[in-house]
Design a protein with these regions (language model features):
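Basic nucleic-acid-binding interfaces
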Residues: 107
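N-terminal core-binding DNA-recognition domain of tyrosine recombinases/integrases
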Residues: 10-24, 30-103
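A detector for short, charged/polar N-terminal pre-domain segments
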Residues: 1-5
Length: 108
């Protein structure tokens, strides 16, 4: 089985060449997945680790950033499962609720 780091590199290459994502999207994915890799210390995540990661993100980032970072990691794990690299996606049946504070409209 590949390492988490190798899988991330392959996923980012696939995003760049096959999915033809924009440079800004790729940059965000790279940052998000690098931070995830650092948090996991290169280990494959299970549900418990994902819950700890979510708690870590909630402390360090705004709700909007947390949602984007989780979307990046979730898409990565979905692709791994789709390609048969993982048997089970740890995001399955993991209910994540991140409340964004409601913003009032700005006055003109």
């Amino acid at each position: 089985m590949q390492t988490l780091s190798q899988s991330i590199v392959q996923y980012l290459e696939m995003c760049e060449y096959e999915r033809n994502l924009s440079a800004d999207t790729l940059k965000a994915y790279r940052i998000d997945l690098r931070q995830f890799l650092e948090f996991t210390k290169g280990e494959w995540a299970d549900r418990d680790m994902l819950n700890r990661y979510i708690k870590h993100l909630n402390v360090c980032f705004s709700p909007r950033s947390v949602k984007r970072k989780l979307a990046s990691v979730r898409a990565f794990y979905h692709e791994l499962e789709y390609n048969g690299i993982l048997e089970e996606n740890p995001f399955h049946k993991l209910h994540i609720r991140i409340q964004s504070p409601k913003q009032l409209p700005r006055t003109i």
